[in-house]
Amino acid sequence: MSASLGATRFRPDLLSLDDLDEAQLHALLTLAHQLKRGERVANLHGKVLGLVFLKASTRTRVSFTVAMYQLGGQVIDLSPSNTQVGRGEPVRDTARVLGRYVDGLAIRTFAQTELEEYAHYAGIPVINALTDHEHPCQVVADLLTIRENFGRLAGLKLAYVGDGNNVAHSLLLGCAKVGMSIAVATPEGFTPDPAVSARASEIAGRTGAEVQILRDPFEAARGAHILYTDVWTSMGQEAETQHRLQLFEQYQINAALLNCAAAEAIVLHCLPAHRGEEITDEVMEGPRSRIWDEAENRLHAQKAVLAALMGGR
């Protein structure tokens, strides 16, 4: 059988989940599901994806690489250590040149503004492989995992506890777009960007979802179908580690928090995890964990993203 996006058309770049409307997001999830089942999609033979990763990566790098190979394309590593990016060449210059050589870029960098500059000058599809502001490909995989478990997305509730970071931003937008309620619980001073929360609330008003920004993790977890967390200290924040360990101590996914959730609740984590900090070993290895399915789904989600953005060019 052949997988297809049907008549759905996409913008050239995926810089934010807000670059996808509700129909496009559902189409991506359906395509990812079809690809996971082994259905074929128009391949990317002869296409080359450049990886510009200014941050360390395991899952994102490997899944993009394998996805591209499985779709018939190739990958080239354009990380700072082996390009002039690491020696201070302006982004606009690098982007203009890469746009003449490769067919798409997956970029992992510290600043969303830098990603946007690549997209502005490259003239080819640019995919957000993680910035300080969002991690959209991760959340496409998360939503795929949730849909596999519950058979639906609308009407569910996700509780995110921890730092209101890039993953939280993409979850807010993604959940709102599919009609899934989301409650985010963070310590004071670590809430998500108010502009992202406001945008998610606006979208939720159309889709019937609810968006809550809370302090109490147990209030957030009450009745939730999905518990989700991320590391308390992200890359680039290592100097804050001890301070954050104290502030986030009550924001751990453990047996007590899981008991507040719905009886059928599952647990997700974007990885890597610091076991014993944001999540206990017991929960990670327990029957409610879907973390390894979630990690696998990065591959299928990113195959769908690559096919959608690069397949018709």
Curated annotation (Swiss-Prot):
Primary localization class, coarse: cytoplasm
Pathway info: Amino-acid biosynthesis; L-arginine biosynthesis; L-arginine from L-ornithine and carbamoyl phosphate: step 1/3
Binding-site positions, carbamoyl phosphate: 57-60, 84, 108, 135-138, 270-271, 298
Keywords, sorted A to Z: Amino-acid biosynthesis, Arginine biosynthesis, Cytoplasm, Transferase
Subunit structure: Homohexamer.
Function: Reversibly catalyzes the transfer of the carbamoyl group from carbamoyl phosphate (CP) to the N(epsilon) atom of ornithine (ORN) to produce L-citrulline.
Name of this protein: Ornithine carbamoyltransferase
Protein's organism: Gloeobacter violaceus (strain ATCC 29082 / PCC 7421)
Name of the gene this protein is made from: argF
